[in-house]
């Protein structure tokens, strides 16, 4: 019983963290640009090599 409680807590923390990161990426134009989130967003979602911050927006590389 104790083990399932620990697993439940870890699972809920992971889900909250995932939702929070996705929210920051989606609302990037309203908050200060974060380099690591910008680069990850460009690589995974847009297929670009990298991205850089030109506050307040994230700009992906051309290639």
Curated annotation (Swiss-Prot):
Disulphide bridges in this chain?
33-53, 38-58, 42-60
Keywords for this protein = Disulfide bond, Secreted, Signal
What this protein is called in its record is Cysteine-rich peptide clone 2
Source domain of life is Eukaryota
* Residues of the signal peptide: 1-23
Q: Which GO terms describe its cellular component?
A: extracellular region
Q: Does the keyword Oxidoreductase apply?
A: no
Give compartment(s): Secreted
Expressed, tissue-wise, as follows: Expressed by the venom gland.
């Amino acid at each position: 019983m104790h083990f399932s409680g620990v697993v439940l807590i870890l699972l809920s923390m992971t889900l909250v963290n995932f939702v929070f990161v996705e929210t920051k990426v989606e609302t990037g134009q309203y908050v200060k640009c974060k380099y690591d989130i910008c680069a990850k967003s460009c690589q995974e979602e847009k297929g670009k090599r990298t991205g850089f911050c030109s506050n307040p927006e994230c700009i992906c590389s051309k290639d």
